[in-house]
Amino acid sequence: MKVGGFQPVRGTKDLLSEEYYKLFHIQNVAQEIGERFGFMPVQTPIFEFQEVFCKTLGDSTDVIGKEMYTFADRGGDVLALRPEFTAAIVRLLLSEKMQPPARLFTAGPVFRYERPQKCRQRQFHQINYECFGAGGSQADAEIISLAYCVLEVFGLHCDVTLEINSLGSSECMNAYRASLLSFFEKYRSELSEDSRRRLQTNPLRILDSKDATDKEILSTAPSIEDFYDAETRASFEGLKDHLTNLGIPYAVNRRLVRGLDYYTGTVFEYKTSSLGAQDAIIAGGRYDNLVAAMGGENVPAIGFAGGVERLAALMSYSRTRKFCVFILPISEEVVSHAMRITYEIRRTLSGVQVICDIVTRLKTGIKRADRQKADIALILGDEEVNRNAVSCKNMLTGKQEEISISNITEYLKAMMAERQ
């Protein structure tokens, strides 16, 4: 552990004001869009019992095998920082005894021990939507359209490609898994180390390999489409029809699988070519067996997550700047008067930033106001106090005038109206 220099832990970063505003703008807008679709906000703890994730994500996944942050507390419980939201939201659904149908939105930080790179840190933020109690292709299309709406609002829908696939029913997946196992056994010695490990645990995960040799082998691998039953085939055709009807362009990718083992049926990803290897910015799918696997009843469910930092890297955002008032008491004797004026403006005017800075030289105070990009500087000295007034300097035009303290709020309202 390197402490010298007091830098952030590798894979984490500080958020300065502009980036903070951008990330939380994304989360706030995402929540508002979710509410249009009937999703209500909830929040789960940052850490859960480790079993919440180990029981659901799959032992063969990188998240469980290599990436999860775990620790034992003083009571002996083994806990984990959440590596994703879905399992935690299912736990919430069950522990709070929510009855489906339920549509839940959440957002916040998640944690994975990965190799840090562009748009891939060990602490990052996600927006997350989970829909419980809705099955069928119509529900799938609605969730995919919600994701499209998020991208559209942020101006990114033209810069992404939607890829869809179906993993089919449990019977389809079992038959396909057996076929893949037989196929990959012929290439065992050529597969990457990760893929050889996945061959023993879940050969479907090899389809997600980024290794060049693995990709070449995959080019002749069996397609899951060959193992669809009639119901799966009809459902997937229905999904394509719904997306076409909604005007949402898509591409079928028969190699598309998700990185967690709980997925069944429809899976999808919105991808971009603008972020290098981290091409998925929104991804999700159906997980009809997960609620039952965690001790609940059989409940159809579908959802998705979006990477907030990845969305932020692609979109432009300019925060609306608050009208800034810089109050300059230029002697200790008038500080109490300046504090009263500052408090009154903050109390009565919304959408305004008020800074009170004690200075001994007016020139220094004006420079500070200029650095702060203040709209108005209110100058208060002994003479102004004696006249029960304040000198108002327009930082844009340089014009300066004296205003009665009793009229200062109305004066600032008028100035704010001019700037709009």
UniProtKB/Swiss-Prot annotation:
It is found in: Cytoplasm. Gene3D superfamilies: Anticodon-binding domain, Bira Bifunctional Protein, Domain 2. One of its GO terms (cellular component) is cytoplasm. InterPro entries: aa-tRNA-synth_II, aa-tRNA-synth_II/BPL/LPL, Anticodon-bd, Anticodon-bd_dom_sf, His-tRNA-ligase, HisRS-like_core, HisRS/HisZ. Its main location: cytoplasm. GO terms for biological process: histidyl-tRNA aminoacylation. SUPFAM superfamilies: Class II aaRS ABD-related (SSF52954), Class II aaRS and biotin synthetases (SSF55681). Keywords: Aminoacyl-tRNA synthetase, ATP-binding, Cytoplasm, Ligase, Nucleotide-binding, Protein biosynthesis. It catalyses: tRNA(His) + L-histidine + ATP = L-histidyl-tRNA(His) + AMP + diphosphate + H(+). Its EC number is 6.1.1.21. GO terms for molecular function: ATP binding; histidine-tRNA ligase activity. It comes from the Bacteria. Belongs to the class-II aminoacyl-tRNA synthetase family. Homodimer. This is Histidine--tRNA ligase. It comes from Anaplasma phagocytophilum (strain HZ). The gene is hisS.
